[in-house]
C-alpha cells in the first residue's frame, strides 16, 4: 500500500471517501488499477468483504454520460514519439500498455506495449484493404508490420503476429482485436489512406508500378527489397554515355539492352512471353550484359535484390516472376540448375506466364500468379539440347558468347553501379500514352513481316518484339540512329527444322543406325534389326530403348515418321512385322534414304514427339 494513502477502517468503507479517491483516478488506467488494488487489500485487512460491489455501484452512479457514451470516449493515444494521435474510446493507451476497465472493476489488457494503426492500404488490383501497424517494444524505436484486416480482426489469426515480436497470445488476442478495430472505426477519417500494390509493372488501372504517386508496397515482405531496388540514382547522362558507347559496337549486349525495354511492351501489344539466353565460357561479359539490362530499371549492385540466380525452387521462381510481372526477370548462373533436362518445364511455365493452381490452408484456392515479360538468362551452356521439345526451343533465343561483349567491362560496371534507373522510367512515361501503344503495335507488324520465313512463328514474334522495343528506345532515349535490325537478330533464331522435334528425333535414330550398322547384319550379336535397301528395320524393343535414351517419345516419333512418309507401317499399327535373322518380329521400319531439303513437314505443337 502507498505510504501516502490513508488506511481506511471497516466503517469508512461504507462511506464515499475511499470510492471518491478511486473515481478521481478513472482516466488514468495504470494509477486507477494501482489504487484499486491498494484499497481492495485495505478492505481485506479490516474485514470489509463488499469492496468490489461498492466500487462498481459508486462508479456507475457518478460517471458522466454524454450522447449515450461514457466520457472516456475522448481518450487519446499517449505514446512517446507516436507517429499519429488517435481516439481510443474507452481504452487507456500509454507507454505502460493498453488497458480498459471491465464491468468487474478489473482491467482488460489488450497489449503490454504501444501499438496502433497508422495507415490504410487499398490494393489497386483487387481492392483488398490492409493496415500498416506500428509498435514499439522498448525505446529503441518504432517498428512496423502490414497485415490484412482479416488477420488483425480475428482473435485466431492475429496471434500469427507474435512472430513479428508483437505481444499477442491466447490471453490477450480478443482484446487486441477489439482495440485495433475500435481505433480504425473511431479514426476512419484520421488514419491516412494510400494506394498499394504487391508487384511491379502494369496495374489494373493502367498505371505502372512503382512509378505512381502515393503508392505503397503491400506484397510479400521478402520482395520488398526488390521493389525498393527499382528507382533512379546518379546522373542519367553518365548512364546514357556509357550505354551509347556499347550501342556503337556490334556486341550482342545490345540485344540484352533491347530485351530489358521489350519486357514492358509485351502486354501492351498482346504478345507471348519469351526468353533470351546468353551462354559461353566465363570472362566474356555475359553477366555485365545482364547488369546493363538491370540498370535500365533499377539498382544493379550486388545485394540490391533485383539481379537473381537460378539457385532456387520452381515455386520460388514462379513467385518471383509474378512479382516482377512486366519488368524483365533476369537470372544468372544457369549451371546451378541440377536437372537441366527437366528444366524444360520451367521454360514452359515462365513463357506461359501463369503459375500453378494451389489450395489455400484456410480452404479454397490461393491467388495464382501471372506475368507478361521477357526473361533474360545466362550460363555456361545452352538451355536447350538435342531432345528438347519444340515448345521449349521455340520460346528461347539463345546467343553463344565466344568473344568479349565489352571493350571495357570494368568501366561499364563502374558507371552503371552509380547511375541507373532513369531510362526505364522515361521509357515507361512515353509508353503509357495511347499514341505510343498504337505506334508499338504498328512497328511490331512491320518488323514481323521483315524477318525471314526460315524461323518459326514464335521465334519471329520474339525477334519482332526486340526490334520494336529497340526502335522506340532509339527514338525516345538514345537518339543515336543505332537501332537493331532484323539482320542483327536473325542469326540467333532457331530455324523451323531445328525446332522440329520429329526431324531431330529421326536424325538421332539415323545417327544411331550409322554408328551401329554392324549390329543390323545377319547373325550379328547382339542384333538390333535388319536392312532392306533404304529401309532400316529396328526391333521394337531396341527402337523404344533408343528413343528413351535420347529423350524422345517412341510413339510420337513414329507418328512424325508416318506423316513425313518415312515409315512403312503395319495394317493397324505403326510397327510392322518383318524378318530378322529369319524370324518374324515387330519392327519400326524406317526409310533412311538421303535427306531431301524439302522433306520436312510442319506439325502442330500438340503432335510433336517430346516427353
Where are these predicted regions, by residue range?
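P-loop NTPase catalytic core of nucleic-acid-dependent motor ATPases
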Residues: 214-303
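A short beta-strand-to-loop transition that corresponds to the Sensor-1 phosphate-sensing loop
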Residues: 333, 372-382, 400-402
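Phosphate-sensing "switch" segment of ASCE/P-loop ATPases
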Residues: 369-371, 387-480
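AAA+/P-loop NTPase substrate/partner-engagement loops
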Residues: 288-341
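DNA transaction DNA-binding modules
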Residues: 27-32, 58-77, 190-246, 337, ...
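AAA+/SF3 P-loop NTPase mechanochemical coupling elements
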Residues: 360-377, 392
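Conserved glycine-centered beta->alpha loop in an early N-terminal alpha/beta scaffold
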Residues: 3-5, 28-251, 319-320, 324-325, ...
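Conserved catalytic/switch belt of AAA+ P-loop NTPases
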Residues: 344-359
Amino acid at each position: 500500500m502507498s505510504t501516502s494513502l490513508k488506511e481506511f477502517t471497516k466503517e469508512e468503507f461504507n462511506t464515499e471517501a475511499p470510492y471518491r479517491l478511486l473515481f478521481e483516478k478513472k482516466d488514468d488506467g495504470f494509477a486507477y488499477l494501482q489504487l484499486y488494488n491498494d484499497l481492495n487489500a485495505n478492505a481485506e485487512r479490516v474485514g470489509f468483504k463488499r469492496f468490489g460491489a461498492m466500487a462498481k455501484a459508486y462508479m456507475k452512479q457518478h460517471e458522466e454520460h454524454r450522447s449515450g457514451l461514457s466520457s472516456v470516449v475522448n481518450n487519446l493515444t499517449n505514446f512517446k514519439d507516436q507517429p499519429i494521435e488517435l481516439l481510443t474510446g474507452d481504452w487507456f493507451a500509454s507507454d505502460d500498455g493498453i488497458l480498459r476497465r471491465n464491468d468487474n472493476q478489473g482491467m482488460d489488457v489488450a497489449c503490454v506495449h504501444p501499438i496502433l494503426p497508422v495507415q490504410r492500404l487499398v490494393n489497386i488490383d483487387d481492392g483488398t484493404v490492409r493496415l500498416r501497424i506500428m509498435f514499439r517494444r522498448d525505446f529503441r524505436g518504432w517498428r512496423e508490420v502490414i497485415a490484412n484486416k482479416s488477420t488483425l480482426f480475428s482473435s485466431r489469426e492475429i496471434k500469427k503476429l507474435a512472430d513479428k515480436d508483437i505481444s499477442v497470445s491466447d490471453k490477450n488476442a480478443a482484446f487486441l482485436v477489439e482495440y485495433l478495430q475500435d481505433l480504425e472505426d473511431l479514426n476512419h477519417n484520421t488514419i491516412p489512406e494510400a494506394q498499394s500494390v504487391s508487384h511491379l509493372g502494369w496495374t489494373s488501372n493502367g498505371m505502372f508500378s512503382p512509378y505512381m504517386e502515393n503508392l505503397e508496397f503491400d506484397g510479400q515482405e521478402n520482395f520488398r527489397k526488390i521493389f525498393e531496388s527499382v528507382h533512379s540514382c546518379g546522373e542519367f547522362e553518365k548512364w546514357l554515355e556509357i550505354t551509347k558507347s556499347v550501342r556503337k559496337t556490334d556486341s550482342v549486349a545490345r540485344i540484352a539492352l533491347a530485351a530489358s525495354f521489350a519486357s514492358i511492351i509485351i502486354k501492351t501489344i498482346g504478345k507471348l512471353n519469351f526468353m533470351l539466353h546468353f551462354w559461353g565460357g566465363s570472362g566474356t561479359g555475359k553477366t555485365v550484359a545482364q547488369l546493363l539490362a538491370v540498370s535500365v530499371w533499377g539498382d544493379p549492385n550486388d545485394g540490391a535484390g533485383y539481379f537473381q540466380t537460378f539457385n532456387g525452387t520452381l515455386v520460388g521462381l514462379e513467385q518471383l516472376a509474378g512479382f516482377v510481372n512486366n519488368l524483365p526477370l533476369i537470372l544468372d548462373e544457369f549451371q546451378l540448375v541440377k536437372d537441366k533436362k527437366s528444366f524444360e518445364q520451367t521454360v514452359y511455365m515462365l513463357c506461359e506466364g501463369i503459375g500453378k493452381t494451389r489450395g489455400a490452408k484456410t480452404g479454397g484456392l490461393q491467388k495464382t500468379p501471372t506475368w507478361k515479360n521477357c526473361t533474360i538468362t545466362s550460363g555456361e551452356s545452352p538451355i536447350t539440347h538435342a531432345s528438347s521439345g519444340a515448345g521449349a526451343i521455340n520460346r528461347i533465343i539463345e546467343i553463344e558468347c565466344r568473344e568479349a561483349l565489352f571493350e571495357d567491362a570494368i568501366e561499364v560496371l563502374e558507371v552503371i553501379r552509380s547511375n541507373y534507373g532513369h531510362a526505364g522510367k522515361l521509357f515507361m512515361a512515353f509508353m503509357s500514352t495511347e499514341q505510343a501503344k498504337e505506334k508499338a503495335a504498328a512497328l511490331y507488324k512491320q518488323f514481323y513481316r521483315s524477318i525471314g520465313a526460315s524461323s518459326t512463328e514464335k521465334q519471329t514474334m520474339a525477334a519482332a518484339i526486340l526490334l520494336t522495343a529497340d526502335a522506340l528506345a532509339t527514338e525516345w532515349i538514345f537518339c543515336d540512329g543505332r537501332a537493331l535490325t532484323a539482320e542483327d537478330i536473325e542469326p540467333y533464331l532457331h530455324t523451323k527444322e531445328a525446332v522440329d522435334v520429329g526431324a531431330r528425333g529421326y536424325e538421332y535414330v539415323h545417327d544411331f543406325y550409322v554408328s551401329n550398322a554392324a549390329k543390323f547384319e545377319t547373325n550379328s550379336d547382339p542384333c538390333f534389326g535388319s536392312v532392306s535397301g533404304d529401309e532400316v528395320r529396328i526391333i521394337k524393343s531396341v527402337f523404344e530403348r533408343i528413343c528413351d535414351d535420347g529423350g524422345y517419345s517412341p510413339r510420337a516419333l513414329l507418328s512424325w515418321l508416318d506423316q513425313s512418309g518415312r515409315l512403312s507401317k503395319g495394317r493397324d499399327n505403326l510397327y510392322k512385322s518383318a524378318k530378322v535373322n529369319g524370324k518374324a518380329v515387330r519392327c519400326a521400319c524406317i526409310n533412311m534414304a538421303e535427306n531431301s531439303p524439302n522433306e520436312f513437314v510442319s506439325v502442330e505443337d500438340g503432335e510433336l514427339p517430346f516427353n
